[in-house]
Amino acid sequence: MNVRAALPPCSILLLAGGRGQRMGGRDKGLIEWQGKALIEHLHALTRPLTDDLIISCNRNIERYAQYADQLVKDDDTDFNGPLAGIRAALPRARHQWLLVLPCDGPLVDEPLLRAMREKAFEYPQRPVMVREGQHWQPLLCMIPVACAATLEAAWLAGERSPRRAMEPLQPVAVQLEANDPRLANLNTPCLLAGINENDRK
């Protein structure tokens, strides 16, 4: 069977609902990198892959609306982290899988997303999560929508870590080498400037 041709459709969630503390309170998804907002880079990558593009955002709703089929927001104003956005998106997803990406990772590429989808095809009942060396990257994951109840139970029990919330579901790894450049996380002004500078060399 041609696995690539058989890949089921997925909903895609771009996480842009954080407080932006490391960016001085700025909305990370709207910060420019290489002349475009970070969310615009992720939109260009993911738009061809889904008819259900969801953005989790808690401010600048009008700006984000142009990049999404759906917007979701946390059910409170406490900025409880990325699990809040995942929790809000899972019941709204139109497909059986939700592929999750952070807005501050613009170097993620299509081959990595394809590898995640192929792994999900092999393990349809379990979350798929990127692992860089020995470290899990829980915000680069695919979650079966059928697992929403487990994550909701973890949330109601006080869990706020996506990785720990998914542990009972036995995530399957997409294994990458340590320091894979595609996982560069531009979550501080210095990192953002450093990547821009390196790209000029």
UniProtKB/Swiss-Prot annotation:
Mg(2+) binds at D104. It is found in: Cytoplasm. GO terms for molecular function: GTP binding; metal ion binding; molybdenum cofactor guanylyltransferase activity. Its EC number is 2.7.7.77. GO terms for biological process: bis(molybdopterin guanine dinucleotide)molybdenum biosynthetic process. It is an enzyme of class 2 (transferase). Gene3D superfamilies: Spore Coat Polysaccharide Biosynthesis Protein SpsA, Chain A. Its main location: cytoplasm. GTP binds at L15, A16, G17, K28, D74, D104. It holds the Pfam family NTP_transf_3. Belongs to the MobA family. The N-terminal domain determines nucleotide recognition and specific binding, while the C-terminal domain determines the specific binding to the target protein. Monomer. This is Molybdenum cofactor guanylyltransferase.
